[in-house]
């Protein structure tokens, strides 16, 4: 009997996302319920955004939640390497095989030509797609241009008519027309694979039997199925999990909800409570109980109990469930958890240099630095009264700063400062005009330790969360203002 093997393959390009933990949890439970194995693979082929720091954060966040894996970059295994950036020679071999078999071709089209083709197609109200320009180039011309070192990619061929039947473990057979599929790039000009080739090759070579992934990948499933067919490989069983959603039913995003696992750890949520809550996202225990452990979820796990309705990630419900876990702890357990959270040595070492020179005794630390140890901060609208800006301008500045910070990939003091500076300059303000708004939003006080240092220490999600709170207190942005301010945001450099 074949051993069940599932996997999670996150990209190390930012803070570890609760959506990653959600999919990892369901893959883990499915594997364990069937006596199988769970694999962690790192998709780091985006060399511009991938970092080893983000990779380590993924390991730390998943382990904090209690999710462990049998094979992976940090624990090894018989199917390594487990980082895609270290498997380039493998992908090249299989990409070349597809070209030799006539299932893929070398494309020399420049980005400028591709942009022009797309623009023409959109002007004709056609779906933008590759036009097949290089698909039938003579072999000798291809070889000559390759020998000359001309930039190129490898594209797969796809049918232009008919439908592809995608067998989904949750939905049954899903029919997707082939004319919706583009000739997907498999190998990029930098010699690294795209998601499609790498996932198919890795899943096959690593013996993955079941792929549980987010439903956002369902529309592109025909490309994966066709690649399995081209290689002559047995396709793993596919399961497209419903996406986590905001309370307004939109896709879960950092613009409306904190999405970083690190945020919930910093806020003082118990890992077992967060994992419990993620387990309730579209799934329920046979007896419908709301509170359960990972071991209990594994014992009773059944994919047939997954609901296709988009599960709502509601911060209030998570907080309620976390409270249930807290109240069931013994006093000793509670005290231990509080100590571990509040007196984290690594976190205290980040804060200490900014507090030490401002206090004369330890009792002054809490009033000065208490905001480092809370989720939200107490806000008073009077703190946002500004000598130079009217209330609408205050809201505009806070909204624009929030939007710019939401697009920030690396959360460092210099980059945070750059975002705020860019907003100020575009609005013809000075940095000193904007900073008095940042202090109360982030610290709850008109003055405190350096607010820029504080934002770096607090982290992206918690800082953005507090800015959202401040905006809500001041009335937020109307639909008309949002449209107007978005145009301003898009014109701000950086």
From Swiss-Prot:
InterPro entries in the cross-refs: aa-tRNA-synth_I_cd-bd (IPR045462), aa-tRNA-synth_I_codon-bd_sub2 (IPR020751), aa-tRNA-synth_I_CS (IPR001412), aa_tRNA-synth_I_cd-bd_sf (IPR008925), Glu-tRNA-ligase_bac/mito (IPR004527), Glu/Gln-tRNA-synth (IPR000924), Glu/Gln-tRNA-synth_Ib_cat-dom (IPR020058), GluQ/Sye (IPR049940)
Source species: Pseudomonas aeruginosa (strain UCBPP-PA14)
One GO CC term on file: cytosol
Catalytic reaction annotation: tRNA(Glu) + L-glutamate + ATP = L-glutamyl-tRNA(Glu) + AMP + diphosphate
HAMAP family: Glu_tRNA_synth_type1
GO MF annotation: an example: glutamate-tRNA ligase activity
Tree of life domain: Bacteria
Gene3D superfamilies membership: 1.10.10.350, HUPs (3.40.50.620)
Cofactor binding comment, as recorded: Binds 1 zinc ion per subunit.
Record protein name field: Glutamate--tRNA ligase
Classification of source organism: Bacteria, Pseudomonadati, Pseudomonadota, Gammaproteobacteria, Pseudomonadales
